[in-house]
Design a protein with these regions (language model features):
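Compact, charge-rich alpha-helical regulatory domains located at protein termini
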Residues: 293-323
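Residues that recognize and position ribonucleotide moieties
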Residues: 129, 286, 304
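Short N-terminal "domain-start" leader segments
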Residues: 273-283
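Non-globular, low-confidence helical/coil segments that flank catalytic cores
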Residues: 1-275, 295, 301
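Short aromatic-glycine-(Arg/Gly/Cys) micro-motifs in beta-strand/loop hairpins
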Residues: 282-298
Length: 323
């Protein structure tokens, strides 16, 4: 079934409602959770290894179900964690730029969506729906592309007088086509395309968006050199405030329909417990040990917790050393 179309009523924001947009800290990938009223939308799911983290993060944020799951395109660093999410959380609508792709990773997303009885759908450019009192519109892609990056779903979210633009991994030729189409790309907040890659975020496109805030979802010390110094310079030249998940952790932007408030959470992945904490987790295996266990992980792979229950909230499982 098609979701309800966005209407002019979405411009009227209730006094007691806010739109919260969380750019989750999923390393070299994208995952963004939007919540407005009692509805939620997850845009992308980071790489496969982030699936367990995403499930634990949604759990800690008291998310019971997802109204919309949107995969901008089937690259692993955008769809990888969605299978774990869909295996755990009911979703009313699941969207992607395609319904089939050559990878097992994307096939798993399709499988879990099918099992829920909500098969993956490809929304058409121009489609819109409501998220609480916010409106969501698919404004791209405006052409068919052979490159999945350029075929990314491009979403515009408006809440009162505030606006967000989510571009997936759209690159410069698709940016130009989008501008030529006459789409309204101006937005207060831009999710910077392709993790700040120099193949995205042309000067002309950034000038057209004219964001006051730009968010780059990117992995620390990644192999790609993201974000590009050129892209950062272009944003700085516009006076845009830049936030990055690799240096600031989770980025939370809240809108009341008029004003945007930005906070950062460097502890979204790991608590701020000290090294003398009684429980030590293994980042790779997601197993937590008591501090006196003989099988502790190496120093570089340790996460510290004050209680075993806290570790479980972060998605860790207890080792047999914990009774």
């Amino acid at each position: 079934p098609q979701p309800p179309a966005a209407s002019a009523a979405a411009q009227q924001t209730p006094a007691d409602e806010t739109l919260t947009v969380r750019f989750l800290d999923v390393g070299q990938g994208d995952s963004i959770l939007l919540a407005c009223g009692d509805e939620t939308m997850l845009i992308d799911g980071g790489p496969v290894e982030e699936g367990q983290f995403l499930v634990s993060r949604l759990n800690r944020l008291d998310v019971a179900e997802l109204t919309y799951v949107v995969n901008t395109h089937p690259d692993e660093d955008h769809c990888g964690g969605l299978a774990a999410v869909l295996a755990k959380y009911p979703a009313e609508h699941v969207y992607s730029s395609v319904t089939e792709y050559t990878t097992k990773v994307f096939s798993n997303v399709v499988k879990y969506a099918d099992e829920q009885g909500h098969p993956v759908e490809v929304p058409q450019t121009g489609d819109s729906w409501t998220l609480g009192s916010a409106s969501v519109q698919v404004i791209g892609p405006v052409q068919t592309y052979s490159d999945p990056n350029n075929g990314s779903l491009v979403l515009r979210v408006d809440y009162g007088g505030t606006s967000f633009l989510f571009t997936g991994d759209m690159e410069q030729n698709a940016e130009a086509d989008l501008m030529d189409s006459g789409a309204n790309v101006q937005a207060d907040v831009l999710k910077v395309g392709h993790h700040g890659s120099p193949t995205s975020s042309s000067e002309a496109f950034l000038e057209a968006v004219a964001p006051s805030i730009a968010v780059i979802s990117v992995g620390e010390d990644n192999d790609y050199g993201h974000p590009s110094a050129d892209v950062l310079a272009r944003l700085e030249a516009l006076g845009t405030t830049i936030y990055r998940t690799d240096t600031q952790g989770e980025i939370i932007i809240t809108s009341d329909g008029q004003t945007l408030t930005v906070t950062t959470d460097p502890t979204s992945r790991e608590p701020a417990a000290g090294k003398d904490a009684p429980f030590i987790g293994n980042r790779n295996s997601m197993i937590v040990h008591s501090a006196n266990c003989a099988k502790l992980p190496g120093e570089d792979n340790r996460v510290y917790f004050n209680t075993a229950e806290e570790a479980e909230e972060y998605g860790y499982q207890k080792h047999t050393c914990i009774k």
